[in-house]
């Protein structure tokens, strides 16, 4: 036991039910919380939620219904949502209204179960053309949806590339942030391998009393056991303020 208290699995919804149940039992036995899994099929190359297409809305809501069952099976609270590609045929204001509309419907499905979808803005360098890329945009959407079941997944790696100014943006978005993910830049490996001052970022998050999960959605700078130990030691270095 090296001290990890949570576990993420983006592909959890695609796994066999028997494996989901086994993973849930193992996590429960070890006192590990389930983190995010991706709730739906993401449209990387063509418009989805931004389009306002009713068939695509229905498809998304059906994914959410299925994700609720998965969440209950694996004792998850959070699920990742990415609204998909921008719709170049529509003004951004109309696209935003379309996204808000369907997320309100999804929130109505999630609220009775105490579950939370977290919207993840993704940077334009790695994922060009997506509708949602910046934290203020996600904040505006979550404020408009106005539901405890619709919050922001603030991926520090993505937002360092897209907008920087990390601590001020985290502060401004704080009341709508439900989850964090981690990765340094460049390289998307563990903290201390890039330009982000994770000691200060973590210190700020801790100072706000955050009790949620910090998801390690990054690679290792070295392979094998040596790389795994370097990751652990990196996290020890950046949380020395505690």
Regions found by a protein language model. Give the residues of each.
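Short, acidic/polar
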Residues: 1, 18-22, 56-69, 162-171
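Active-site-adjacent beta->alpha loops and helix N-cap segments on the catalytic face
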Residues: 15-26, 89
């Amino acid at each position: 036991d090296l001290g990890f208290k949570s576990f993420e699995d983006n592909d959890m919804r695609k796994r066999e039910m028997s494996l989901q149940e086994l993973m849930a039992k193992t996590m429960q036995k070890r006192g590990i919380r389930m983190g995010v899994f991706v709730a739906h099929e993401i449209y990387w190359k063509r418009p989805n939620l931004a389009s306002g297409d009713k068939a695509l809305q229905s498809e998304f809501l059906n994914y959410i219904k299925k994700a609720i069952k998965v969440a209950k099976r694996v004792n998850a609270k959070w699920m990742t949502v990415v609204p998909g590609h921008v719709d170049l045929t529509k003004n951004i204001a109309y696209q935003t209204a379309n996204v808000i509309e369907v997320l309100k419907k999804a929130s109505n499905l999630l609220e009775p179960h105490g579950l939370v979808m977290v919207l993840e803005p993704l940077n334009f360098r790695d994922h060009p053309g997506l509708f949602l890329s910046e934290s203020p945009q996600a904040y505006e959407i979550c404020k408009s949806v106005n539901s405890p079941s619709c919050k922001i997944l603030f991926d520090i790696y993505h937002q360092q590339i897209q907008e920087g100014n990390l601590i001020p943006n985290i502060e401004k978005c704080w009341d709508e942030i439900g989850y964090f993910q981690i990765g340094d830049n460049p390289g998307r490996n563990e903290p201390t391998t890039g330009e982000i001052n994770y000691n200060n970022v973590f210190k700020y998050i801790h100072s706000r009393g955050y009790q949620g999960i910090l998801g390690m959605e990054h690679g290792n700078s070295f392979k094998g056991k040596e790389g795994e130990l370097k990751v652990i030691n990196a996290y020890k270095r950046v949380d020395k303020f505690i």
